[in-house]
Amino acid sequence: RIEKNVELSYDESAVSKGRKLKDLCDENALKDIEAAISLVSSAGKVGVIGYCWGGSLSWKAACEKVNLSASVCYYGGDIPSLINLKPNCNVLTHFGELDQGIPIDKVKVFKESKPDVLTYTYPADHGFNCDHRKQYNKVCAKIAFDRTLSFLEQNLC
């Protein structure tokens, strides 16, 4: 919607550009998710997975869209500040305990206030699941991946 063929790395200038693009399209992103859900929902149950900003969008989609069966949110930075939202589907969240952008005390408050949301924390940093980042943690990524597959199997199959 904003710029074609955007592919960003994880260096400082790319992250800065990504934040600017996010600010320009936050509202439209949920509309795009809704359109994608609509497109595939005739095939059966639909789930979403997001990482970082996408993790926050997956949380928002779970709370604002009623035709989702599952949502998986990896280290969504906005999630603790959206604690007032109530999901309409089953949700699984993954957070890194060493993530300085998402304070673990806020994650704990979120977890306590949302007992129906499966929330896991890992001894890892933000981006622990991305093998293109220095924060990648193979062990934690594997555990989170296995939990994600199990969750999706339970909720989509």
Tell me the role of every PLM-derived stretch:
Residues R1-C157:
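N-terminal cap/leader regions of alpha/beta-hydrolase-fold enzymes
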